[in-house]
C-alpha cells in the first residue's frame, strides 16, 4: 500500500477499506509514515467525512494500536462513565462512588484538562498524596477489594490517539465527527469495561456546539461501542451553562464532596443521580426508577461519601480532607466580580468562563504548565437568576493577581443580562440507547 494513494482516495470522497485504515494507523505508530502525510489524511477526512463502517474500523485500529487491558480478574460487572468535557464538570467524583456503593465495579481511567475544560485527574491531584499513576496490578487490586479506583490514562493504551490528537490540535482538524468518535471510543475500548455510559455535552461550553451534532456524536459512539460488544447508553446534556457553582480544581473537589454530603448544587446533584441511575440500570441492578432511588439513598445514607474517602485513602491520599473539606487551602488572592447592570442572566458563553479560569491558573496553556490547584471561579449567580447593579456575580481565585483583569473582563463580556427572564431549559436534553 502507498500512503499517497490512500490520501488521494479520501480526498476524492471515496471510502477507505478496513485494511487500508489499519495499515495507516499501524505504520504511523511505528514511525513509518510522516506527520505531514497523516495531516493531509486528517484534513481529507475533515472535509469528506467517513461512513460509520470507516469510523468503526478507525476506532478499532486506534484501540488495537497499543496494549489492551484485561480486567477479567476483576470480579463482577465493570462500568465506566465518560464525559466529552465541559466547564465545572466534576460528575465523575460523585457518580463513581455512588455506583461503587451498589456493588458495581468502577475501574476508571480519566484524563487531564483539555483546552477550556477541566480534567478529573487534575482535580483528584488537588487532594494531598493522591496517586493517579498506579501500576495496573495495584489498580486492579484496589478495584477488587474496594470496588472503585480512578487513575490517569495509561500511556501504552491507544498510543495512536495521542499521536493523532497532537497532530489534529495544530492542523485545525479537531472538530471532525469520525476523528472525535475514534479518539474517545478508541481509548475507552482499550480498557476492559462491560458497560459504558457517555455524557455528551452540547452548547457553548462543549466541543459540540449544537444539539444535532451532539446527537450524531452520541449515536455513533453508542453504535460503535455495541459493535465492540459493550452495553452502551448516552445522555445529551446542556453545557450552555457551567455545571454547579465551582470552576477550578480544589474548588470543584470541595463542591463534589458537598454533593456527596447531600448539600450540592441542584443541577450537579440532578445530573450525578441520573448518570449513576443509568449506569446501575445498564448493569441490571433494577428499573430506572429503582436505580434512581438507590443513587439518592447512597448520598443520603453517607455511604457514597465514605466510599469516596476510602478510595482516596486506598490511592495514597489523605482521607481526612474528604471528611473535613475545610482543610483545602484557599487561594492567596480573590476578587469579587460585580454586575454592570441589573436584570436577569439570560445566557453565558460557558467556554469563556472556562478560559477565564484558565487565565487564573486553573488549567494549562502548554503541557509543561503547572496548575494552581486553588485557582478558579465561584459563581454567585447563574443563568435565570436576577442580579442588581453592583451585585456580586462571581468570585475569582488565584495565587497570583496577574490574571485577574483579563479574567474579569472575559467573564463579564460572556454574561448576558437582559430585563426579561429566560425560559427554563432542561439539563438532560436526550438519551441515546
Annotate each language-model stretch with its function:
Residues 60-83, 136-166:
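Self-splicing inteins and homing endonuclease
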Residues 144-195:
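Phosphate/diphosphate-binding glycine-rich loops and adjacent basic-rich segments that engage nucleotide
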Residues 109, 143, 151-154, 184, ...:
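Short beta-strand segments
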Residues 123-149, 219-225, 229:
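A glycine-rich helix N-cap at a beta->alpha junction
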Residues 77-100, 104-116:
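Glycine/serine-rich anion-binding loops at beta->alpha junctions
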Residues 5, 10, 15-17, 68-69, ...:
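Well-ordered secondary-structure scaffolds
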Residues 47-48, 93-107, 187-192, 227-228, ...:
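Alpha-helix C-terminal capping segments
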Residues 1-88, 259, 307-318, 428, ...:
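Acidic, glycine/proline-rich low-complexity segments that act as flexible tails and inter-domain linkers
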Amino acid at each position: 500500500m502507498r500512503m499517497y494513494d490512500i490520501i488521494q482516495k479520501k480526498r476524492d470522497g471515496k471510502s477507505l477499506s478496513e485494511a487500508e485504515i489499519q495499515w495507516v494507523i499501524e505504520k504511523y505508530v511505528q514511525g513509518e509514515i510522516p506527520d505531514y502525510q497523516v495531516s493531509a489524511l486528517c484534513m481529507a477526512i475533515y472535509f469528506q467525512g467517513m461512513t460509520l463502517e470507516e469510523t468503526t474500523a478507525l476506532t478499532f485500529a486506534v484501540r488495537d494500536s497499543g496494549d489492551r487491558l484485561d480486567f477479567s480478574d476483576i470480579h463482577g460487572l465493570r462500568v465506566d462513565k465518560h464525559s466529552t468535557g465541559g466547564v465545572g464538570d466534576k460528575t465523575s467524583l460523585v457518580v463513581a462512588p455512588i455506583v461503587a456503593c451498589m456493588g458495581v465495579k468502577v475501574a476508571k481511567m480519566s484524563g487531564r484538562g483539555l483546552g477550556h475544560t477541566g480534567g478529573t485527574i487534575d482535580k483528584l491531584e488537588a487532594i494531598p498524596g493522591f496517586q493517579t499513576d498506579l501500576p495496573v496490578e495495584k489498580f486492579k487490586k484496589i478495584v477488587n477489594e474496594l470496588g472503585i479506583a480512578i487513575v490517569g490514562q495509561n500511556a501504552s493504551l491507544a498510543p495512536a490517539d495521542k499521536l493523532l490528537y497532537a497532530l489534529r490540535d495544530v492542523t485545525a482538524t479537531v472538530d471532525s465527527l469520525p476523528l472525535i468518535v475514534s479518539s474517545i471510543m478508541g481509548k475507552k475500548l482499550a480498557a476492559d469495561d462491560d458497560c459504558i455510559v457517555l455524557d455528551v455535552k452540547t452548547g457553548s461550553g462543549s466541543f459540540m456546539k449544537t444539539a444535532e451534532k451532539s446527537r450524531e456524536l452520541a449515536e455513533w459512539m453508542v453504535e460503535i461501542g455495541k459493535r465492540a460488544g459493550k452495553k452502551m447508553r448516552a445522555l445529551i446534556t446542556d453545557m450552555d451553562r457551567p455545571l454547579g457553582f465551582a470552576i477550578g480544581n480544589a474548588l470543584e473537589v470541595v463542591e463534589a464532596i458537598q454533593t456527596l454530603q447531600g448539600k450540592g448544587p441542584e443541577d450537579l446533584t440532578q445530573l450525578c443521580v441520573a448518570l449513576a441511575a443509568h449506569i446501575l440500570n445498564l448493569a441490571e441492578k433494577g428499573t430506572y426508577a429503582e436505580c434512581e432511588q438507590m443513587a439518592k439513598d447512597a448520598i443520603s445514607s453517607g455511604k457514597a461519601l465514605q466510599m469516596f474517602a476510602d478510595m482516596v485513602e486506598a490511592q495514597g491520599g489523605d482521607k481526612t480532607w474528604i471528611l473535613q473539606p475545610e482543610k483545602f487551602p484557599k487561594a492567596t488572592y480573590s476578587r469579587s466580580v460585580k454586575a454592570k447592570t441589573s436584570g436577569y442572566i439570560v445566557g453565558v458563553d460557558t467556554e469563556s468562563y472556562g478560559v477565564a479560569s484558565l487565565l487564573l491558573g486553573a488549567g494549562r496553556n502548554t503541557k509543561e504548565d503547572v496548575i494552581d490547584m486553588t485557582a478558579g471561579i465561584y459563581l454567585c449567580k447563574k443563568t435565570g437568576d436576577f442580579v442588581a447593579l453592583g451585585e456580586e456575580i462571581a468570585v475569582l481565585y488565584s495565587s497570583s493577581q496577574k490574571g485577574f483583569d483579563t479574567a474579569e473582563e472575559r467573564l463579564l463580556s460572556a454574561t448576558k443580562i437582559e430585563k426579561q427572564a429566560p425560559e427554563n431549559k432542561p439539563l438532560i436534553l436526550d438519551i441515546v440507547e
